[in-house]
Amino acid sequence: MSEMTPREIVHELDRHIIGQADAKRAVAVALRNRWRRMQLGEEMRHEVTPKNILMIGPTGVGKTEIARRLAKLANAPFIKVEATKFTEVGYVGKEVDSIIRDLTDVAIKLVRETEMEKMKYRAEEAAEERILDALLPNPRNTWGEEEKADNSNTRQIFRKKLREGQLDDKEIELELSASPMGVEIMTPPGMEEMANQLQGLFQNLGQNQKKKRKIKVKEAMKALIEEEAARLVNPEELKQKAIAAVENNGIVFLDEIDKICKRGESSGPDVSREGVQRDLLPLVEGCTVNTKHGMVKTDHILFVASGAFQVARPSDLIPELQGRLPIRVELTALTTDDFERILTEPNASLTDQYKALMATEGVNIEFTKDGIRRLAEAAWQVNERTENIGARRLHTVMERLMEDISFDASEKSGETFVIDTDYVNAHLGKLIEDEDLSRFIL
């Protein structure tokens, strides 16, 4: 679980996302409150529930990017789901309970990696001994039985060589665990849980089987470390820790929640809209979900919902769900200045990406300040005239601008291209000015 302060979280998000200070502050405080709650006494900890967030803003302003970056910072079970993929229980489609099942699977993977990392030193020692046994087998008598031999000095010499990497390419024969059976089970939509249980059953069938393989020492070391670490980890303890991590630190990011709002003119059962909201309600307010790893309580899972709300409004959500999303954050539409900053300031910005890609062919790209400004203006103008898709427009504009250079790069090794206002106007001018062209091409 992350122990970063809200200021540190915002600073980290600033490295990748331009603007949207309110949204960054809201998610930073929510993430820090997870840590604060864990410092409380048992009784008070049970009473403190997370304050779920609703992020409202046009497409392409950073809602989903905040979720992606938050997942890396959280160091906790995190899952991002599209609200449009679900339908009401009893109809064809995914049920909302699968969100918690998937979140638990994420937690199992996260905890297993952490536990195996703790056991790495012991696993390395055990793997080393098994490789030395394969390199220096005990002699056999006339009846084929192994005899103990005093080869401690030779073993130490080989151990030294093994650690120095001198034996990496030597081939040895080892008994390794057989790979689990890869069985793909097709089930009707909405029956994913049955498929998971059947897959688990087939995987368990070949779990304890061993298989002799000829393998190089370097690859054997990696395989044996994983095998030994997995053997040292207690599966029951792992499940308990994973479920505790989900219940106390789990975060669910619900994207496109505006697409499940009921539209005024529709009538009859709305199974993929209002029906989904009704099914989401128990999860958000707290219930118990049955997963293959055990029962999971959702009372303290943090839900962050986001939507563009261009057609619907937040008030179109059912009142009970509105009440469960108390923190509202509005993200603002991007300006020309924002586009200019997006092109240059974030880590691995778009301009840096294109420079690095072309450098692989020996082509040098230089973006001037006025060229970047003109690019930002071009993206903003097209957004204003056609559909406003936010920062995603920059990808389209940049790809169109770099099309000729990208195509000829392999023949232009050693050359330098300067992207200035004139270059941008020459390659994008007509497209920007002609509304019909920009509507279909940009």
Swiss-Prot record:
SUPFAM superfamilies recorded: P-loop containing nucleoside triphosphate hydrolases
Keyword entries, A-Z: ATP-binding, Chaperone, Cytoplasm, Nucleotide-binding
GO MF term set: ATP binding; ATP hydrolysis activity; peptidase activity; proteasome-activating activity
Any one Pfam family match given in the protein's UniProt record, by short name: AAA_2
GO cellular component: HslUV protease complex
Residues binding ATP: I18, G60, V61, G62, K63, T64, E65, D255, E320, R392
Subcellular localization: Cytoplasm
CDD domains for the chain: RecA-like_HslU
Cited InterPro entries: AAA+_ATPase (IPR003593), ATP-dep_Clp_protease_ClpX (IPR050052), ATPase_AAA_core (IPR003959), Clp_ATPase_C (IPR019489), HslU (IPR004491), P-loop_NTPase (IPR027417)
Record GO biological process: protein unfolding; proteolysis involved in protein catabolic process
Main location class: cytoplasm
PANTHER family: ATP-DEPENDENT CLP PROTEASE ATP-BINDING SUBUNIT CLPX-LIKE, MITOCHONDRIAL-RELATED (PTHR48102), ATP-DEPENDENT PROTEASE ATPASE SUBUNIT HSLU (PTHR48102:SF3)
Family the UniProt entry places it in: Belongs to the ClpX chaperone family. HslU subfamily.
SUBUNIT field: A double ring-shaped homohexamer of HslV is capped on each side by a ring-shaped HslU homohexamer. The assembly of the HslU/HslV complex is dependent on binding of ATP.
Function: ATPase subunit of a proteasome-like degradation complex; this subunit has chaperone activity. The binding of ATP and its subsequent hydrolysis by HslU are essential for unfolding of protein substrates subsequently hydrolyzed by HslV. HslU recognizes the N-terminal part of its protein substrates and unfolds these before they are guided to HslV for hydrolysis.
Name this polypeptide is given: ATP-dependent protease ATPase subunit HslU
